[in-house]
Each structure stands twice: as structure tokens, then as C-alpha cells.
């Protein structure tokens, strides 16, 4: 499925917004982006990390946007400390504190992440949001979101639990990773992604930056530390800013899936778990919980020289 026309419209809209806010004072810009991004999860928008370079030099200054959008086209969120539980850069094979860089900022910063790329090898940018509670205005919006993410019977489950169809509440949390290849030609393909123990996590089981480029990417989905079988994974392939292709896959019994790669493209892999919250009828807590995983990387068109 290709999103050319829709992508062009969204890009034009975002550019118009950026032109407007460019002339606002910093505090007004921060407020605008905070308000602008609040309602986006209601339309099941993805959340992902996009670094300023997927292949930086060692110790290069680097930024990372936290993007909220759909079909790999989105608006950058601002840095809001209260909405962040984890924001780190993990160096290649990072097991010691010296190879772990905490990413911090000031309220309203955009891009939200500023860092130094660090030592050569495959590094991982990790972002975990704080839990956020939302309310769907009607059952149709909830059903559309659930079906898009592979939970066709969620609304039936909701009714079977005796819950109201108006003002359906959900608590959601996001877990995003981005893979970057740091260093010159001598480090092409060095390092690997790894399971970090996030509540939901996508792990690339091959290095996307190796040369010659990979023909396909094996990924594994984990939930609560265990491989997750029979789960939907959505892959967005960005050929250029106005040409994004979307495909859906299912994990096997070991939580694995595999999809084709093309050189010179950016990739966003997304998966969501939607599950009922226990005791939602008796308590004031949300009726549903969703946890989101995303993984971004690039497949190089030419070897880095």
C-alpha cells in the first residue's frame, strides 16, 4: 500500500505549521507543540525516533526527533520531562555505565534529543514514555484503532465485559528504538541490536548497515521479556518523503518475522499490544491498556567511505 497523495498533503500542512510557529517566542512554540500532539494518539498514530543522521561519524553532534504521525510522516514532539521515563543512547555492546549516555533537555526543546554519537559501532537510541490516559469520544474510533492494530474483536470483548460504549478509556505507553551506525568504512556492519528488557520491544536480528546490503530483515517481538507469537507487525518503507509503502506481517510461534529490504530506504517497524485492564469496572482506572513498540533504521545505498 503506497501513500503518495496523503503524504504530500501532510508534508505541506506540517511545513505551513512550521512557518507559522517559527516567528513565535520559545514559550509559545513549546505550548503549541504540547497541545498539538496531545490528541494524536486518539487516531492511532505511530511514535518513533528519527535521528538527524543514521550513519554519523564518531563523537559527532547528533539530534533525535520524537515523531508522532501516520504512515511514516509526522510532526516532531517537544521535550516534556514529565512524559519521559527513559531516553538514552547505548553504545555498541554497551554493558557498562560509561557506554550509556542519558539524553536530557529543557522543556520545549525541539528536536527533543541532543547527544554525541560516541564510539564506532551499532548504537541504539531508546525512548520510553510515561503512561498517558486517553478517552475515545465514541466506540467507532476505538474499534477503528483496534482493527488497524490487529485486534478485530476488541469491541466485542468490551461489550462482553459490560462496559459502556461511550467514553472508552485507555492507558497507553510507548517504547521506541532507533539503530544508528557510528563510524567509517572499517566499522561497516559492526555491532548488533539486542533485547533490552522493555515491556514491548522489537529487536533486529541482523545489522541493517552491513555491506553488501541485506536482502531481508529478521526481527523478533518481545512482550514482558518473552517472545510474542501471532502478533501483528507493521513495516513502513520510506522510499522518499512523498513515497511510503506499508505492509503487515504476523510473528511466528517464536515471535519472529521477516520482511524484504531495499537499499537506500528508511524503515519504521511498529507493533502494538491492546489488552483489557483488570478491575476497570470497579475502579476509576482505564478500561484498556496499549503498549507500543517501534524500531527505526536505514539501509544504506552505498558503503560509507
Residue ranges and their predicted role:
Residues 40-44:
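Sec/Tat signal peptide C-region and signal peptidase I cleavage site
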Residues 45-63, 153-217, 222-227, 239-242, ...:
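Beta-strand-rich domain onsets/edges
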Residues 27-39:
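Bacterial N-terminal signal peptides
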Residues 130-138, 275-280:
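Short acidic/polar inter-strand loop motif in beta-rich domains
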Amino acid at each position: 500500500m503506497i501513500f503518495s497523495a496523503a503524504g504530500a498533503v501532510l508534508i505541506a500542512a506540517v511545513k505551513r505549521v512550521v512557518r507559522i510557529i517559527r516567528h513565535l517566542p520559545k514559550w509559545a512554540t513549546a505550548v503549541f507543540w504540547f497541545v498539538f500532539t496531545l490528541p494524536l494518539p486518539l487516531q492511532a498514530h505511530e511514535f518513533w525516533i528519527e535521528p538527524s543522521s543514521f550513519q554519523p561519524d564518531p563523537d559527532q553532534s547528533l539530534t533525535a526527533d520524537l515523531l508522532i504521525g501516520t504512515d511514516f510522516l509526522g510532526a516532531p514532539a517537544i521535550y516534556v520531562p514529565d512524559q519521559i521515563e527513559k531516553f538514552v543512547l547505548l553504545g555498541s555492546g554497551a554493558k557498562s555505565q560509561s557506554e550509556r549516555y542519558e539524553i536530557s533537555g529543557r522543556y520545549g526543546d525541539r528536536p527533543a534529543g541532543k547527544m554525541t554519537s560516541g564510539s564506532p559501532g551499532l548504537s541504539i537510541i531508546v525512548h520510553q514514555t510515561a503512561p498517558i490516559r486517553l478517552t475515545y469520544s465514541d466506540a467507532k474510533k476505538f474499534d477503528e484503532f483496534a482493527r488497524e492494530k490487529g485486534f478485530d474483536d476488541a469491541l466485542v470483548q468490551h461489550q462482553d465485559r459490560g462496559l459502556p460504549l461511550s467514553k472508552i478509556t485507555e492507558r497507553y505507553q510507548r517504547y521506541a528504538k532507533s539503530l544508528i551506525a557510528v563510524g567509517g568504512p572499517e566499522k561497516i556492519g559492526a555491532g548488533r541490536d539486542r533485547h533490552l528488557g522493555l515491556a514491548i520491544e522489537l529487536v533486529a536480528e541482523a545489522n541493517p548497515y552491513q555491506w553488501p546490503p541485506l536482502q531481508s530483515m529478521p526481527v523478533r517481538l518481545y512482550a514482558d521479556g518473552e517472545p510474542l507469537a501471532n502478533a501483528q507487525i507493521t513495516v513502513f518503507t520510506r522510499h522518499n518523503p512523498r513515497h511510503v509503502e506499508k505492509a503487515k506481517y504476523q510473528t511466528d510461534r517464536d515471535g519472529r518475522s521477516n520482511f524484504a529490504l531495499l537499499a537506500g530506504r528508511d524503515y519504521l517497524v511498529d507493533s502494538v499490544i491492546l489488552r483489557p485492564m483488570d478491575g476497570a469496572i470497579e475502579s476509576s482506572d482505564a478500561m484498556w491498556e496499549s503498549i507500543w513498540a517501534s524500531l527505526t533504521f536505514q539501509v544504506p545505498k552505498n558503503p560509507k567511505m
